[in-house]
Amino acid sequence: MINGQDKGNKQMTFSILAQDLNTGAFGGAAATGSLCVGGWVLRGDSRFGLSASQGAAPSTMWGEDALLRMQAGDSAEQALAAVIGQDAGRDWRQLALLDRAGRTACHTGTKNTEWRGALLAPGLVVSGNLLAGPQVLKALRDTFLTATGDLAERLLASITAAEAAGGDTRGLQSAALLVVSDDAPPLTLRVDWSENPISALRDLHSRSQSGAYAAWLPTVPTRNDPERGHD
């Protein structure tokens, strides 16, 4: 468990999981008032979908096991039911899922601090707890649906809007972005601590899209081009 600072050592988070209907790519973004949100929350595989495991006592095993269930053919709802199972601590946890077919599911335990909840739509799920109010999730969802640019840019716009809408009641300390696709290398960006983590994440994303790093990316193997290399 990470140190949640002044709120009883609770990790509270808002996150978004989404599918790009044009490219088939999956992406997620998250921010929290504690450390290392990327390592705790976001997991994904372009073949199976995404998970976001968060809450007062987040279970990384839930996120990992849900992906395995979706790999085996479970829908998001089936995977959710299976991993929650008989976990006696489930009321302290929150888990959002997005499967390969764009189906979504979310569990929000009742012992997570208000405001807590989720909004679900085909190919999109936003969730959070210890938020300023429901307007945070509405900003996440609505901004993603109206934003322009590629999947990463839309996700960054969404968490920026969520922060402006009130975000996490403690203020934010870390932020992360994950995009997985059969046609591109994974994009995994994390700001594990910053006074302005979303701004820092946006800067890191800009750096990843330019210069020597961006020039190197087309040489890396992908699911659809596994033998790619340097000419």
Tell me what each language-model feature is.
Residues 2, 8-231:
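N-terminal nucleophile
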